[in-house]
Amino acid sequence: MKHFAYSILGCLLLSLNAAFAQKTWSFDGQDPLLSSDGKSLLNLYTIKEIPEFVTGVEGKALRTDGYSTWMDTTTEGDVSSLSGWFALESYPTDTAAFMGIRDMAGTSVAVCVDRYGELLLGMGQNGSYSYCSLKTKVDRFKWLHVVLDLSNESVCLNGQRMSAEVWPRNLQDGEMILRVGKDFREKKVWMYDVTA
């Protein structure tokens, strides 16, 4: 399992249209999983005894591996975009996600990377999951600013906008799940989730 992507998350932003507000997590301070406004808590899932908080692009970062350490939270409102800073230490052995969002009907969209470093848009609906190439590769050991722009149906990498050839149907308004470090695809071996 050592060959999974090790992504390091430096800062995560969640823009909400409804309140014209922004949720920010920086992983600094006494409660690193609490948003800067003190209202939203990220749920951290890990098989490790102690999660690894390391030096990030600014402040602290959380080391994830695409399958055994990830975070999520539930949010209300019309989400317009997600953004975060990531760095890959290796490419994953299977497609892994930087971040994504899913509505309560099960429609999801995520920014992912494959075993060759190709950036992908991951889309899920009705229990099936597919990927669309964004026709760009990402480097290892470099900080990447990734934006999932739901309003404009595009992804931005370090300020460069990339449009996907396909995009999932619109997410339904209301409660949504934001996930970082793992996508919404389920892949199990016996009872164990091995989603990369």
Briefly describe each language-model feature range.
Residues 7-15:
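Bacterial N-terminal signal peptides
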Residues 19-67, 191, 195-196:
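Extracytoplasmic low-complexity segments
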Residues 25-27, 81-93, 99, 146-148, ...:
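Short hydrophobic/aromatic patches on beta-strands that form ligand-binding or substrate-lining surfaces
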Residues 64-82, 132-137:
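Short surface loop/edge beta-strand patches of beta-sandwich-type extracellular domains
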Residues 97-121:
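Glycan-recognition/cleft segments
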Residues 123-145:
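Short, aromatic/His-centered strand-loop micro-motif at the edge of beta-sheets
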Residues 142-151, 155:
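Short tryptophan-centered beta-strand motifs in secreted/extracellular beta-sheet-rich domains
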Residues 165-193:
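Flexible glycan-contacting loops in extracellular carbohydrate-active proteins
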